[in-house]
Amino acid sequence: MLEQINSPYDLKKLDIKDLPRLSEEIRQFIVEKVSKTGGHLASNLGIVELTLALHYVFNSPVDKIIWDVGHQCYVHKMITGRRDKFDTLRQFNGLSGYTKRTESIHDIFGAGHSSTSLSAALGIATARDLKGEKYHVIAVIGDGALTGGMALEALNNIGRSRKDVIVILNHNEMSISENVGSLSLYLSKLRTDPTYNKVKQEIDNLLNIIPPIGKSLHKYIEKIKDSIKQLVVPGMFFEELGFTYLGPIDGHNVEELIEVLERSKKMKGPLLIHVVTKKGKGYMFAEKRPDKFHSAAPFDIETGKFVGEGKDSYSDVFGKTLAEMALKDEKIVAITAAMPEGTGLIHFAKLIPDRFFDVGIAEQHATTFAAGLAVEGYKPYFAVYSTFLQRAYDQVIHDVCIQKLPVVFAVDRAGIVGEDGETHQGVFDISFLRAIPNIAIMSPKDANELVEMVKLSRNLDFPVAIRYPRGKAGEYDISRKPSFPLGKGEVLLEGEKIAVFALGRMVSKSIDAAEILKGHGINPFVVNLRFVKPLDEELILEISNKVDLVVTVEDNVIAGGVGSAILELLNDKKVYRPVLRLGFPDKFIEHGDVESLFKKYGLDSQSIADTILQRYKEMRGS
């Protein structure tokens, strides 16, 4: 049946009775494809019926369906003509794992970060009304994303606007008992009936025109009605914001979903439809551990085991090191914004739960929460992906750095992350953090250096950012102690004529590039910078004065990066040397495997060597 579906129009040809069977085919397809490519499995398995119902009832792309975060869009992509591209999901030059406006007219709004859909939906609905057009605007948002402050701001604004916006709350974490669910479903059916709403309004009008008893009676009835609703309707919060609340609805009963969505099309004003789904539905391992299969690496379908499972990542190295430190130091606390597994803080959470804080999708709050802890003498470590730290930039400046509070930002997924693409590449953090006074920025060349930097940060009494990449870490010794002070780099290879200053994971690539250059008779210095701020100015100036060409290599955009910092230093100190800065260009970096992206942008070892060799030859006129 799935083979027949290449557009929403094809889906609408099916009988409703056929949709449950189609749902199962889709789940099998998703498990098979994601097991090979990796991707967001659990959330997509949980939203199959809801996606089918949305495309069955509404007319995309005339009606605008907006997916919050975008990672649960696989079924949407299949229905809208991209099923044949799923072998390339998240691969270099392949299908994006998120909604992307350049990929399809059905992807109304691009996403990757959470809590943005409601604001976008209100903007689109407002534009619709200003232009005098007629179509439906639907935003699909999960209960996790609803914890984001931006989503709550938008809910407040939508309710106040009274505009026709349909919000689908995909509630996939809590089961709702059957009696409450049945009662709520009954109330939803009643309240979605246009006849009921018309009668309700007529009764309200009638009560209001009987003075003075009418008004007081109306008030009394409203009090009774509100009291009853508080007892039996879980959506009172949304009602108070100005929404008509419908639900909860069984998110895996496609016929009920279609019925409610059809009724909702006829209603006016802001609507919130509460849909209950199960993450990972249909695949046993994902149902048991939806957190593990949220963003999954390739895996074995039969066993549920991931390819390469068992090796520690940089996140694990950080998490285990911090947990070991905290066992001996009661002032250390750990904070995550809904990413305990991804950031490696799960190790800390298990050992020291009373000093572990998961604040939900709330990076702004997490940062200022950390600042408050620091004011009272604690040492907070906020582990956050580089791309999500962007969301707390004002708090980093205003609440942490201006007050010079000793908060440590463990900046995970720094640099290129690969398959998640433009919205997740961590290639801006050096640039946006380097401009802020009072903060130290460091980046380890390997896992052992990460252990040392985490321990070094403990006794620094000002803000610190430690940036490290996604990926496996290699061997490391968690008992290591810091072997270098703040702001001190190291010379890894002595050389002549050319100096290569590298940061973080680009150090190993620079060493490999130096070996290639030796084959051309060139022996460059290779320096592990370790620190972006403060720079090891003494070492940089000493080496730069010995060479004809200075090269910087970083896993960050060139604009404002560590190469810019070194160029500024040399200029200020009147050391006039040509500086070749290698990093990412002034563009958003697409999705693909990390090594393919490094090669495309000239940051693999061979490309680094080739670029240096070419520039050196140009300088010599040969």
UniProtKB/Swiss-Prot annotation:
SUPFAM superfamilies: Thiamin diphosphate-binding fold (THDP-binding) (SSF52518), TK C-terminal domain-like (SSF52922). GO terms for molecular function: 1-deoxy-D-xylulose-5-phosphate synthase activity; magnesium ion binding; thiamine pyrophosphate binding. Its cofactor is Mg(2+); thiamine diphosphate. The keyword Lyase does not apply. SMART domains: Transket_pyr. One of its GO terms (biological process) is terpenoid biosynthetic process. InterPro entries: Dxylulose-5-P_synthase (IPR005477), THDP-binding (IPR029061), Transketo_C/PFOR_II (IPR009014), Transketolase-like_Pyr-bd (IPR005475), Transketolase_BS (IPR020826), Transketolase_C (IPR033248), Transketolase_CS (IPR049557). Homodimer. This is 1-deoxy-D-xylulose-5-phosphate synthase. It comes from Caldanaerobacter subterraneus subsp. tengcongensis (strain DSM 15242 / JCM 11007 / NBRC 100824 / MB4). The gene is dxs.
